[in-house]
Amino acid sequence: DFVQVMWHGASLDATTAGYLTALPLLVMLVSIWLKRVPLKKLLLPYYIIGAALIAIVFVVDMGLYPFWGFKLDASIFLYLDSPKEAMASVSVGFILLRLLVMVLLTGGIAWLMMKITPRELETVKNKILGTLGMLLLGGFLFVIIRGGVTESTSNVGQVYFSSNQFLNHSAVNPCFSLLSSMGKSK
């Protein structure tokens, strides 16, 4: 079951990763034409904010799923109007543990991203070829974000594969689920 959840969920994970990769790709595209762009310095705030948002969404999803029985979606914002009522049913320890996990995840993700990001790109000798290569990568990224080249785009239902609803929910990327439901609730 674990392998099937991972396999079926990979498409939404790829879509979510594609969205998160778009800004660094644009920064790298611009850095082809400029000299000594400080990639790490430019991307550090993006990495920290992105890592914090990912950590918050994943931890909140894991914390709420046992109570709600469905993936995190835009309905969470209805409860944020009255946070005291929302937190009245859980212990302080429950909340503190999740806050600790959020901090550790944020730090771990941001640290990893900084580790794999070069301080600056080496000078690209053929800027036209470098630009074409980055645009080709951008096109590939667009296909990943869209979910392929077929008529249907990425959606939560595409990862459902089982009669067991828990397995289907496990395959859904919580960041994708939240953003998708926010787009539909407007």
What are these regions (language model features)?
Residues 1-184:
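Transmembrane and membrane-interface helices of multi-pass
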